[in-house]
């Protein structure tokens, strides 16, 4: 597996650049609006630009914090215990599941993801840079049989290996949020075996 280590300073620099670009784009819309458009049209366009760009900036900040503090890009992290009150990685964490998290970069090619067969409830959601769910693996969509999946970015054009299902991300960066049902702390070992 290829991993990419990003230093916290590089993350901060990328986030500053993203915020600067978003601000510059909004300023450009406002200046152009003052010259060519009515005030109402200018406000509407600025609002649309903000609504469009804000999720990308927030997602990148979330990614930068994760890779600076928990794990590098392309590394799956398993949370071994229930979250306590200090847990801030997800807005409202579940208190009956253990999490598996990763930020995946498909710039250098696709990734293989294997979901083991299990009767236990588990869901693996894949989100794009706008935080839209583009794939959700679990009992509702794949049943309990598990499977092998090829996660590819928007421009990948290779052959999907036999026995694998293609999951196409609309963006080069994807966020994996996995949850496995846990029946109390005494059940941790069984969940850890599934996460492995």
Predicted segments with their positions:
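A compositional/structural signature for long, glycine/proline-rich flexible linkers
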Residues: 2-6, 10-196
């Amino acid at each position: 597996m290829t991993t990419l280590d990003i230093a916290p300073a590089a993350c901060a620099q990328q986030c500053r650049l993203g915020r600067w670009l978003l601000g510059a784009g909004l300023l450009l819309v406002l200046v152009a609006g003052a010259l060519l458009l009515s005030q109402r049209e200018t406000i509407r366009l600025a609002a649309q630009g903000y609504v469009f760009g804000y999720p990308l900036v927030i997602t990148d900040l979330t990614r930068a914090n994760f890779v600076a503090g928990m794990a590098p890009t392309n590394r799956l992290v398993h949370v071994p215990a229930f979250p306590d009150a200090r847990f801030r990685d997800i807005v409202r964490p579940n208190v009956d599941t253990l999490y598996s998290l990763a930020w995946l970069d498909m710039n250098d090619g696709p990734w293989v993801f294997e979901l083991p067969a299990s009767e236990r409830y588990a869901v693996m959601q894949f989100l794009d840079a706008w935080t839209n769910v583009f794939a959700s693996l679990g009992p509702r969509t794949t049943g309990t049989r598990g499977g092998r999946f090829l996660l590819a970015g928007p421009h990948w054009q290779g052959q999907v290996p036999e026995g694998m299902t293609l999951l196409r991300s609309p963006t080069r960066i994807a966020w994996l949020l996995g949850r496995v049902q846990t029946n109390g702390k005494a059940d941790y070992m069984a969940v850890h075996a599934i996460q492995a």
